[in-house]
């Protein structure tokens, strides 16, 4: 065991101050909302397609699950396709000197970005979704 620290004799101790300090006032949160406290780091919200991927998976194959790594890959894939379609749609709108991206630009972008049969199915599903949205 380590040796104990020796006690100082009473003569060496500092005299206790007899002056009383004024009591601290109670702080009431004002306009700043109690900014004196430590601020918690705000979490940056991250938008993902994970819940939608899972819903589609359960519609197509109700008995099959998906690993977190596979889900991450699917999320990256959808983000990539979204960026490609958005970029192509923006180019088409610029070429035609239009300030707005409409369903027509999106449809043309789908035909340009996706290959063959996949583009045909995507266009038909997109048209069906737009029709359902406008009718409701």
UniProtKB/Swiss-Prot annotation:
Q: Where is the protein situated, by its record's location annotation? A: Nucleus; Chromosome
Under the heading InterPro entries, the entry gives: Histone-fold, Histone_H2A/H2B/H3, Histone_H2B, HISTONE_H2B_site
Q: Which GO terms describe its cellular component?
A: nucleosome; nucleus
According to the UniProt record, where is the region Disordered? 1-44
Q: Where is the composition biased (Basic and acidic residues)?
A: 1-36
Q: N6-acetyllysine (modified residue): where?
A: 7, 26
Q: What is its main location?
A: nucleus
Which Pfam family, an example, fits this chain? Histone
Q: Does the keyword Acetylation apply?
A: yes
In what way is this protein post-translationally modified? Can be acetylated to form H2BK6ac and H2BK33ac. Monoubiquitinated to form H2BK143ub1; may give a specific tag for epigenetic transcriptional activation.
Q: Does the keyword Nucleotide-binding apply?
A: no
Numbered residues of crosslink Glycyl lysine isopeptide (Lys-Gly) (interchain with G-Cter in ubiquitin): 132
Miscellaneous note, as given in the UniProt record, is: Phosphorylation of H2B was not detected.
Regarding protein family, the annotation reads:
Belongs to the histone H2B family.
Free-text function comment from the UniProt entry:
Core component of nucleosome. Nucleosomes wrap and compact DNA into chromatin, limiting DNA accessibility to the cellular machineries which require DNA as a template. Histones thereby play a central role in transcription regulation, DNA repair, DNA replication and chromosomal stability. DNA accessibility is regulated via a complex set of post-translational modifications of histones, also called histone code, and nucleosome remodeling.
Question: What assembly does the database describe for this protein?
Answer: The nucleosome is a histone octamer containing two molecules each of H2A, H2B, H3 and H4 assembled in one H3-H4 heterotetramer and two H2A-H2B heterodimers. The octamer wraps approximately 147 bp of DNA.
Tell me the protein's name. Histone H2B.5
